[in-house]
UniProtKB/Swiss-Prot annotation:
The gene is atpH. InterPro entries: ATP_synth_OSCP/delta_N_sf (IPR026015), ATPase_OSCP/d_CS (IPR020781), ATPase_OSCP/dsu (IPR000711). Pfam families: OSCP. F(1)F(0) ATP synthase produces ATP from ADP in the presence of a proton or sodium gradient. F-type ATPases consist of two structural domains, F(1) containing the extramembraneous catalytic core and F(0) containing the membrane proton channel, linked together by a central stalk and a peripheral stalk. During catalysis, ATP synthesis in the catalytic domain of F(1) is coupled via a rotary mechanism of the central stalk subunits to proton translocation. One of its GO terms (molecular function) is proton-transporting ATP synthase activity, rotational mechanism. The keyword Transmembrane helix does not apply. This is ATP synthase subunit delta. F-type ATPases have 2 components, F(1) - the catalytic core - and F(0) - the membrane proton channel. F(1) has five subunits: alpha(3), beta(3), gamma(1), delta(1), epsilon(1). F(0) has three main subunits: a(1), b(2) and c(10-14). The alpha and beta chains form an alternating ring which encloses part of the gamma chain. F(1) is attached to F(0) by a central stalk formed by the gamma and epsilon chains, while a peripheral stalk is formed by the delta and b chains. It is found in: Cell inner membrane. Transmembrane segments: none annotated.
Length: 220
């Protein structure tokens, strides 16, 4: 008997009935920039699901719309404690996962491709991996376009001016092709963090306090 993940994800997705489409505006914060994986690297469960969704959206000619919804859903997960707890709930059976995920996707107004894809994820009891799968889709897209993926974390949502200034500073540092993801993190207290690969740029108040505490311990 094949396991829950031994399936052609693209063919399974295509058998689901379509639903209505819509967009969700995303406003997130906190900066982490990570080097994208090699395009040819498809190891791991999340990467396989990510590739299936990316290829399906490309074949159907609505990749741009799907990527926008992927970013919006990833942002919603990052910003909602309740949503993260729901996705991580191992007690939920397949029927419950499918029902609640359908309600969630309808409420957020996503299109049929992403909605059916999340349905497959729920059917296979892989909702705890959803955030990683969405990250994989965005990383794959950035890799194909020769970009570096930047995840931004800040205590407050970035303004358009702050976002433009950050992109300019990253370009000055040699990162001219950067795709940013943004998340809010109140624990930073103020400022932001930016990670590029193994390099962390930390201007947050929390980071400054930590460095001060470490310096005081070293001087003791």
């Amino acid at each position: 008997m094949p396991g829950p993940d031994s399936f052609d994800a693209r063919s399974r997705i295509s058998r689901f009935r379509p639903h209505s489409a819509a967009d969700l505006v995303r406003r997130n914060t906190r900066v982490t920039v990570t080097q994208v994986p090699q395009v040819g690297h498809t190891g791991g469960l999340a990467q396989r699901y990510a590739r299936a969704l990316y290829d399906l959206a490309s074949e159907q000619g609505n990749l741009s719309d799907v990527l926008g919804e992927v970013k919006a859903l990833r942002a919603a997960i990052a910003e909602s404690d309740d949503l993260r707890k729901f996705l991580a709930d191992a007690r939920m059976d397949i029927r419950q996962g499918r029902t609640v995920s359908n309600v969630l996707m309808s409420k957020l107004g996503f299109g049929d491709v992403l909605r059916r894809f999340v349905g497959v994820i729920a059917d296979n009891r892989r909702l705890p991996d959803l955030a990683s799968i969405l990250d994989g889709v965005l990383a794959l897209d950035s890799a194909l376009r020769g970009e570096v993926v930047a995840e931004v974390r800040s205590a407050q949502p970035l303004t358009d001016t702050q976002r433009s200034q950050l992109q300019a500073r990253l370009a000055e540092a040699g990162y001219s092709r950067v795709s940013m993801t943004e998340r809010t993190d109140a624990a930073l207290l103020g400022g932001m963090t930016v990670r590029i690969g193994s390099t962390l740029f930390d201007t947050s108040i929390a980071g400054r306090l930590t460095r001060l505490q470490n310096a005081m311990k070293g001087a003791a």
